[in-house]
Amino acid sequence: MSKIKFGSQVYTWFMQGTGKGYDNKLDHMIKVAAEAGFTGIEPMVLEISESALGCGKYWLGDFCDPIKLKDSLDAHNMTLAGLALVCAWDGEEEAPNERAAADFTIDLLKHFPGAMLGTVTLPSGRTSDLQRRRLNVARNVNAVSRRATDAGLVCSYHPNSPPASLVRTQEDYDVVLSSLDPSVTGWTPDVGHIIRGGMDVIATLNKWQHLVNHIHYKDYSGNGPEPWSQMGTGKLDFHKITEWLVQRNYEGWIICEDEAHVAVDDPDGVTLQNGIWCKENLHPIVGL
């Protein structure tokens, strides 16, 4: 039986109206992901959801309630793969609102044994104090992860690649990933963000393989300000990346998200198509 599972990330739906299109509709996302053949889902805990976007609390809304979340997952035979906690974390210590979001996430995850606490940096600009702020990110991620580990959770840090992201290039990775405390957090390589940051995916995986405990898949076109393509149509060799995981006896989730333009208009359809693509192309590699 395969030790690798395939899940879906809610960001595919978040893009429509910057959260407004599918606000408080996590049950719908769970349903579609299940229909696509995914067995898990990874929602976000977006700290700025209410204050900056005018959406529901943490972009979970009613599903901040662990009972409501569990009921929706159970109705579709789905697992909570993890929660992606999104904060800036570039101050000297966690801001009060960031700490509140982190503590909420830790408390919610206590109801879902085995689900990952993902820490994701909210892009906050690269124009000033870059080195200090990168180190702040590592310090704050370590602090969150230490509290979560003390609560019995497993954690993983997820960098990204928008132009304003603090952790997007080889130099950024060298600073931040080497400053993570491996006793409390691993690393989630997002292969699309790695290539967008100008790095080779396999070389980067090799360099930091001791930290890999979660992974995100999305495809990359290299064209335009949002250089994404639907899974299987871009420049990434997902077969090779998946073989890399199998060869290293990776156990855990492959979380698929799609940021291609077509996904903005039709996140359901793209998720269904990507589920089929994974089943046909990647499931055989992992033994599903």
Predicted features by range, described:
Residues 1-39, 74, 100-103, 167-189, ...:
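Histidine-acidic metal/acid-base catalytic patches
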Residues 12-14, 45-47, 86-89, 121-126, ...:
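Active-site-proximal loop/turn and secondary-structure-junction residues that shape catalytic pockets
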Residues 36, 41-50, 82-85:
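Short, conserved active-site loops that position catalytic residues or coordinate cofactors/metal ions
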Residues 42-70:
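Glycine-rich, proline-tolerant flexible connector loops at the mouths of alpha/beta enzymes
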Residues 53, 122-123, 226-228:
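Vicinal oxygen chelate
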Residues 56-59, 86-95, 192, 230-232:
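The substrate-binding groove and active-site-proximal loops of carbohydrate-active enzymes
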Residues 66-67, 71-82, 88-187, 196, ...:
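Active-site acidic/histidine proton-transfer and metal-coordination neighborhood
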